[in-house]
Every structure is written in structure tokens, then in C-alpha cells.
Amino acid sequence: MKIKEVIVVEGKDDTKRIQMAVNADTLETRGSAISDETLDQIEDLYDKRGVIVFTDPDFSGEKIRKIITEAIPGVKHAFLTKHDAAPSHKGSLGVEHASPEAIREALAHLYTEVPDGEPLISREDLAVAGLTSGPQAKEYRRRLGEYLRIGYTNGKQLYKRLKLFQITPDEFKKALEYIKNEDNY
């Protein structure tokens, strides 16, 4: 599988794992303290080839994703579930632990930001669905993030991410039906 865009990852181990799964060029941020020089490189690559942000499903990965998104609106995003990024032994979550199949699957389900898009799902929709409060809210958000392949978020961030990626009411409804069926988990 050849990827035209440059994939932005956190470190060299992520690059190695990505290149085991697909034929792609990567750019490493070398952690969550992204320099202006690195952001300039990402912006240059975005203009020339396109960019896919593919970070770990943890706090640092989300921080990197947010920094890049704010600096360069319109980048594409690939997400791994925490399960797919879990180490087989001790350690933290990371792209470097994902199987080649999980990486290819994430890259097959990219999201492109629509920074100024109108929200298609309301905050009320999230509340009615039990995604912002209640005993199951956190678990439902986790499942929703996995099903839609948009990563885990808290209630406030979920609204922003659904808007950013223009998740449709139909996609949202199908996801809710799936995540609330206990037989699927």
C-alpha cells in the first residue's frame, strides 16, 4: 500500500512500524514539544504532498494532534484504538506497538478536518445519547471513538471532534446503535 501523503508520527519507532505496514514517508515530531521549525516543515509538506497526523492514542499524542491542527487546518487524521496501540508487555500506548494490519486499517479510514463546518450533531444529541453525563458516558464515548475511528475524547472534545470531522447524523445513529448493543463488547 503506497501512501502519497507524508505521515507525521512522534518518533523513530513509529516510523519503523509505519514502514513495516505501508510504503510511506514520515516526519517525526520527536515528542510533544513541537518546534516552530518542525511546524514549518509540516506546513511545507502539507502544501506539496498532503499530511496525515498519526499519533499515539494518549495525552501526548492528542496534544501533538491539537498543535498541528491549530497551526495547519485541513490536515488528515488517522487514529488507532488504545487496544491496537497497547504494548504486548510493559510500556505505554503507541503506534510502535500496532500491528501492520491495524495501521493499514487506520490509514484506510482517514478523516479530513472541516475547520469551519457547521455542527451536524448537537450538544443536545450527545446528552440525549448519554455521552456527556451518566454512569455509562465514559464507556460510550470510548466505544463511539473506536467505532467511528476518531479516538477517545471527553464530552466537550467529542462535540468538537464530531464537528471537525463532519460526522453525519446517519453515521452517528449507526454508531450509537452499535455501541449500545452489549453483544458487540
Curated annotation (Swiss-Prot):
Annotated signal sequence range: none
Primary localisation category: cytoplasm
SUPFAM superfamilies (alphabetical): Toprim domain
Subcellular location field: Cytoplasm
The reaction(s) this protein catalyses: Endonucleolytic cleavage of RNA, removing 21 and 42 nucleotides, respectively, from the 5'- and 3'-termini of a 5S-rRNA precursor
Any single Pfam family the record assigns to this protein: Toprim
Superkingdom assignment: Bacteria
Needed cofactors: Mg(2+)
Cellular component, GO, one term: cytoplasm
Gene3D superfamilies recorded: 3.40.1360.10
Binding residues annotated for Mg(2+) 2, in chain numbering: 56, 58
Single GO MF descriptor: ribonuclease M5 activity
NCBIfam families xref list: 5S_RNA_mat_M5
Cross-referenced PANTHER family: RIBONUCLEASE M5
HAMAP family referenced in this protein's UniProt entry, alphabetically: RNase_M5 (MF_01469)
Protein name per UniProt: Ribonuclease M5 1
Organism of derivation: Ligilactobacillus salivarius (strain UCC118) (Lactobacillus salivarius)
Name of the gene: rnmV1
